Swiss-Prot record:
Catalytic activity: cytidine(1402) in 16S rRNA + S-adenosyl-L-methionine = N(4)-methylcytidine(1402) in 16S rRNA + S-adenosyl-L-homocysteine + H(+)
Species of origin: Burkholderia ambifaria (strain MC40-6)
Gene transcribed to yield this protein: rsmH
The protein's name in its UniProt record: Ribosomal RNA small subunit methyltransferase H
Family recorded in the similarity comment: Belongs to the methyltransferase superfamily. RsmH family.
Major place of residence: cytoplasm
Gene3D superfamilies for the chain: Putative methyltransferase TM0872, insert domain, Vaccinia Virus protein VP39
GO CC terms: cytoplasm
Xref: SUPFAM superfamilies: Putative methyltransferase TM0872, insert domain (SSF81799), S-adenosyl-L-methionine-dependent methyltransferases (SSF53335)
Compartments it resides in: Cytoplasm
InterPro entries: RsmH, SAM-dep_MeTrfase_MraW_recog, SAM-dependent_MTases_sf
Pfam families in the cross-refs: Methyltransf_5 (PF01795)
rRNA processing is among the record's keywords: yes
Length: 313
């Protein structure tokens, strides 16, 4: 319960107000977390409405199972499974999809989960600790090239190659020092390599972000769920996505723009604009947390919410 109290849902009212356009519709919360958005959606739904939520984190599932509401169900899986999971429930169309990306405060604040460089803990970083390869396991086998690519591409870290070499050098000392399996040591290694300091940011921030994204396949899953959401939305249905770093937001922005624009056609061809198929999406807005929300919850500072609506059947 303590962890739930520590988590403040970002852009709560704005997201739910943008999402729920039909109280008797079927909605999807792709990232249940500690249930802030889901509970607010349920409060707006009519008796005939339904909400299906997804989460990989077993602790999120435990929290969700305490919601006693016949309109609500939870799926213990990545939101990338959305299309198949809804099909298995006989659902072909939904009125809205909400995605609140990234890690939740309880995940970051619990050293045992291995997401944070601020407190020492096991080097795990999996959203679902019961499935897949942990960060420590991946670091124990990844090549310098793979490490460099992940840290550079997912962390936008300009010292990626130097960090990768340091990690592989540390691995060569495993017989003497034991495996690299704590967040504290990883942060220390990165701190020795990254000599420049960004104001208000720990030198390990970008590397931890990169490894977390890789371990959880976050960007690949995001692309899958955006495609699924587009096919699942009914006409008038809303896609609401909250991102917390530029990599996620760039994918969401480009996806919405691509599907809200008419297809490109060679001007030399005898085709009129009115004869082209209409784009399936209309971009509604982009929103940021208010100053008051950022003061109350500093982790909201980097959030950006994008909203699009399905305009074709």
């Amino acid at each position: 319960m303590g962890n739930e109290l520590q988590h403040r849902t970002v852009l709560l009212d704005e997201a739910v107000e943008s999402l729920v356009t039909r109280p008797d519709g079927i909605y999807v919360d792709g990232t249940f977390g500690r249930g802030g958005h889901s509970r607010a959606v349920l409060a707006r739904l009519a008796e005939a409405g339904r909400l299906i939520a997804f989460d990989k984190d077993p602790r999120a599932i435990e929290t969700a199972q305490r919601i006693e509401d016949a309109r609500f169900s939870i799926v213990h899986d990545s939101f990338a499974s959305m299309r198949d999971a809804l099909a298995a429930r006989g659902i072909e169309k939904v009125s809205g999809v909400l995605l609140d990306l990234g890690v939740s405060s309880p995940q970051v604040d619990d050293p045992a989960r291995g997401f944070s460089f601020r407190a020492d803990g096991p080097l795990d970083m999996r959203m679902d600790p019961t499935r897949g390869e942990s960060a420590a396991e991946w670091l124990a086998r990844a090549s310098v090239q793979e490490l460099t690519e992940v840290i550079r591409d997912y962390g936008e870290e300009r010292f990626a190659f130097q960090i990768a070499k340091a990690l592989v050098a540390r691995r060569a000392e495993s017989d003497r020092l034991g495996p690299l399996d704590t967040t504290g040591e990883l942060a220390q290694i990165v701190g020795h390599v990254v000599k420049t300091r960004e104001k208000g940011k720990d030198p390990a921030t970008r590397t931890f972000q990169a490894i977390r994204i890789h371990v959880n396949q976050e960007l690949a899953d995001l692309q899958v769920v955006l495609d699924a959401a587009l096919s699942l939305l009914e006409q008038g249905g809303r896609l609401v996505v909250i991102s917390f770093h530029s990599l996620e937001d760039r994918i969401v922005k480009r996806f919405m723009q691509a599907h809200a624009s008419a297809p490109a056609v060679d001007r030399r061809l005898p085709i009129r604009a009115v004869d082209l198929p209409s784009p399936p999406l209309k971009i509604i807005s982009r929103q940021f947390p208010s100053e008051a929300e950022v003061v109350a919850n500093p982790r909201a500072r980097s959030a950006v919410m994008r909203i699009a609506e399905r305009v074709t059947p």
